[in-house]
Amino acid sequence: MIHTDIAEILCVKPKTTKKTKTMEEDVKKTTTMKIEGEVVVMKKNLLDFKDVMASLLDRVNELLGRRVSLHLISSHQPDPANEKRGRLGKAAHLEKWVTKIKTSVTAEETAFGVTFDWDESMGPPAAFVIKNHHHSQFYLKSLTLRGFPDGEGGATAIHFICNSWIYPNHRYRSDRVFFSNKAYLPSETPELIKELREEELKNLRGNEKGGEFKEWDRVYDYAYYNDLGAPDKGPDSVRPVLGGSPELPYPRRGKTGRKSTKSDPKSESRLALLNLNIYVPRDERFSHVKFSDFLAYALKSVTQVLVPEIASVCDKTINEFDSFEDVFHLYDGSIKLANGHTISKLRDVIPWEMFRELVRNDGERFLKYPLPDILKESRSAWRTDEEFAREMLAGLNPVVISRLQEFPPKSCLDSAKYGNQHSSIRTEHIESNMNGLNVQEALEQNKLYILDHHDALMPYLTRINSTNTKTYATRTLLLLQADGTLKPLAIELSLPHAQGESYGSVSKVFTPAEKGVEGSVWQLAKAYAAVNDSGYHQLISHWLQTHAVIEPFIIASNRQLSVVHPIHKLLHPHFRDTMNINALARHVLINSDGVLERTVFPSRYAMEMSSSIYKNWVFTEQALPKDLLKRGVAVEDPNSDNGVKLLIEDYPFAVDGLEIWSAIKTWVTEYCTFYYNNDKTVQTDTEIQSWWTELRTKGHGDKRHESWWPSMQTRDDLIETCTIIIWIASALHAAVNFGQYPYAGFLPNRPTVSRRFMPEPGTDEYAELEEDADVAFLKTITPQLQTLLGISIIEILSMHSTDEIYLGQRDSPNWTADDEPLEAFKRFGKELELIENNIIRRNNDKRFKNRTGPVNIPYTLLYPNTTDYTREGGITGKGIPNSVSI
């Protein structure tokens, strides 16, 4: 530490060098001006309710002269000690810290005045250094310089958007530097901040930093999914490492640096279950508001603690719903926990006062869940064939259904390994229910569709069924009718051959029936199909294809794209909170014996199965138009805005999604065109090229040799890539996440587990089905304890945070200094508002039956909510957040 730094900390005036005549002449030539600034911060103690002492120590430091200092950095004059860097201005300090910062449990921002002595000849500052000499960290939101000369006789403001935690200075090996909101391509960066730009990226890469990362470390690096298992607990807790091998490929996650387990050096050790302080770079962690909202998530996750108490819910049988009335009681407060002892114990370990109120111990305790949308109109509409089919187009997993292009359906599994896996559905099963069409006519008229989970599940089915799960690989055939709705024609349930997988599958085909035992069998067949779809939704459509695949982009962007890079500014809002939510998911959701394994049918094989699906993941096919073409639900149409025409006109996800996709692409095109004049500017952008190389070779390293990756040699490559990233992080995630509680909060509609096979005639189970179909149904699907745990989790996962930032919104109006991108962003917002109106209009149009269905749930999962600034949050069933934030 140099002597001036020590002097600053101790508030001692350093010994000055005797002025020479030349120095005095230089001083006369300079014109010093006062620059008034405003710094917005949030103190740590406002977030950490038990850390009042930190606030007191900060005040003591302030009184002793250990203050928060800022130095502006010139973009015009070089530093005499390092000509590659801009000259530092005089230190300025935050004013009135002691009187402005209050010890409070409310997370309030505080604005401090700061006055800089600035030499006019140094020009406008391009960056600043901040040093925190206090005891504890604080959140630095922004610095704004007011009244800075604009060179034309007027004055302007210079904005520095920071949004970063500043730890005490001794925690860092280099200065904390922040740049103004002006965007620069690498080649256009002012010479005197180029080195700072490059050094900041090196800091974020960590330079192969070893050991476990600490909360103040700002390191972004890659790791395999090797922290899902707990091999030190025994063989039942071992899980394979995902990523780094051809057999089990996977996107990379953020590195934590935790040590290996004792039993397996390839596996990373885990934190205690209730310890949520998993390392992610501090600025990637939830905001104070989001964390407060999300603590409820942790509360629900420890429902496992209450399992012995919850078992007393039933009056007849343990862990079973005796009737649908029992299930309905979950939503009216009739489920009682008579023993408050466990509740009281749980309450005592929650250190946050506001959340103790969630588990009050004031007498009798009741579990009560909000009524899911699926039940609000009718308690039985969910059981109709129309609703069953409609949810494939407008439910919580509308991204799997495809057009049947050959009959019978064919399998793509290796016949040498799995035998004959082709479908056993034949024309005689379905033609009598096809409204006068035969199969060939229906194929030619694009009327046959399929929900096909057969190939995804069959390789794992023997192992899955060796657990408590008893399920099938399913295919569901549907007919597109004249009114635009889909009608189920048949459901095929398949099992591996008893003699082994190589002997093929053994299948049974079930067709619609309404009455008698045949009707009950059909309801069970739909339940098995729903179990498949629920598991695929949670593991693949939701976790893998949004959460997991986007994390490598976040890591690569922070390692290779400077905060002043225009593409960093474009993408950064779409990465908010994702690393934090993914880390928490690894900790309590997708880990061995975690919530997912407890509540979804693949159980311990769930994540391994998602790795198998990742083998076929193609980045370019995540573009919505290409996805629709791949699934055959659209055809190419050069006359349409997106180049495709839907074959199902009333396909709410696709109709709304294409409008959102088009709006995003227009916005990205206008933005990128402003900074990139031609293809060469993309080719010569060193940061973009490094970013793209690292993303392919490290972030998605198991797919580094795939030929489908864009070459990133044209502006169109960049535009399409950024559009796909934003689409995945915002709209695609919203479509598959926020409908969870509205549709699956009533688990019989979206069961996640099946516990026994289809009853065979002549068995006790078949007799039970004949006698009481509802009891047989409930004994087949997710049992009571898993239901309580499952809906507790999806209730939280379906909630918008009260600090949600929706597509078309930014957390600061000054996110860039460039006027044209700001205007383009306003146009983007206006377009999203038009889409909101279009969605409302379509939902009210009675011609579009799939937009509401028998359950009367308007399709709003892709309603942008750009116009909503209320910050109310909760389960709304609408709104596209900028990022995968829950």
UniProtKB/Swiss-Prot annotation:
Disruption phenotype: Increment in the number of lateral roots, and moderate increase in the length of the primary root. Reduced performance of green peach aphid (Myzus persicae) on foliage. Enhanced disease resistance to the fungal pathogen Fusarium graminearum. The double mutant plants lox1 and lox5 exhibit enhanced susceptibility to the bacterial pathogen Pseudomonas syringae pv tomato DC3000 and the biotrophic powdery mildew pathogen Golovinomyces cichoracearum. Pathway: Lipid metabolism; oxylipin biosynthesis. Induction: Induced by the green peach aphid (Myzus persicae). Induced by infection with the fungal pathogen Fusarium graminearum. It comes from the Eukaryota. The keyword Oxidoreductase applies. Its EC number is 1.13.11.58. One of its GO terms (biological process) is oxylipin biosynthetic process. Expressed in roots. GO terms for molecular function: linoleate 9S-lipoxygenase activity; metal ion binding. Pfam families: Lipoxygenase (PF00305), PLAT (PF01477). Residues 234-266 are annotated as: Disordered. This is Linoleate 9S-lipoxygenase 5. It comes from Arabidopsis thaliana (Mouse-ear cress). The gene is LOX5.
